[in-house]
From Swiss-Prot:
It is a multi-pass membrane protein. It is found in: Plastid, Chloroplast thylakoid membrane. This is Photosystem II protein D1. The gene is psbA. The modification Phosphothreonine is found at T2. It comes from Lobularia maritima (Sweet alyssum). The record marks A344, A345 as: Cleavage.
Amino acid sequence: MTAILERRESENLWGRFCNWITSTENRLYIGWFGVLMIPTLLTATSVFIIAFIAAPPVDIDGIREPVSGSLLYGNNIISGAIIPTSAAIGLHFYPIWEAASVDEWLYNGGPYELIVLHFLLGVACYMGREWELSFRLGMRPWIAVAYSAPVAAATAVFLIYPIGQGSFSDGMPLGISGTFNFMIVFQAEHNILMHPFHMLGVAGVFGGSLFSAMHGSLVTSSLIRETTENESANEGYRFGQEEETYNIVAAHGYFGRLIFQYASFNNSRSLHFFLTAWPVVGIWFTALGISTMAFNLNGFNFNQSVVDSQGRVINTWADIINRANLGMEVMHERNAHNFPLDLAAVEAPSTNG
């Protein structure tokens, strides 16, 4: 009898826990994805803060020349970063217990791998949690689909690119100047500015910003006035009201006259699908581009291929970019290479008589 009561009580406790986890009445929805998201993101955030403040220098290139990244070792907010895991570790899974000591783990950049892997798991669970809450509320799933774009971008630079290059040391540093360094080296080694998928990503981000500003300003400018001229139009609304707040017909008419008729949407759903799809698809393409360049399928390199009828080279901006890439490649990791890879790959001229 006692055993039966204990089992019922434990089942009841588990049932109450399940109901609490999946309840949409909580101030913040947790969900089953949240059970994994909360500890992983808390771990990533905590280790990031501690390492950004106090981590010792890291031997990023694996040549016994540690690079400082924390505030206590001379950096500021702009120059500071979590330095990527050492090239000596490569792609090996490197938790604390795999190192001989905590000092060795810190010297080899163990915190970077810990932060990145927990962060990627956490943001993936956040995306799943968006879908889960939408499902519980009977909503459509497109919020999580839209969020998949930044998740794909983060996965590309923190995981796919290091896998393709063979080492977590090639991942993006977790800091402002470190991000810029990553971008410059990426351009030098992969010519990303000449990659069509990066161009689509630029169009997606800049175009999305433009369309967002246009939409917000149009809606704000075409509010249906519910008040007199002597009081704010904002006073005529309450949060969550059923009635339309703005007149899409008026906005459509304004924009159609400003540019031309078919440049404007007269259907709210089509308009908002476009506002969502444009930046999301652009960022998807950029993430796909980085994931292919990770395996050295690089941007266009015309190599002085534009010639006149006599075969003479016509210099283009593409050739200027190639020269800039060589300069950037010469300067990065100066003590790890004697020559940039592009120069070292060329066969040496014969010196015989």
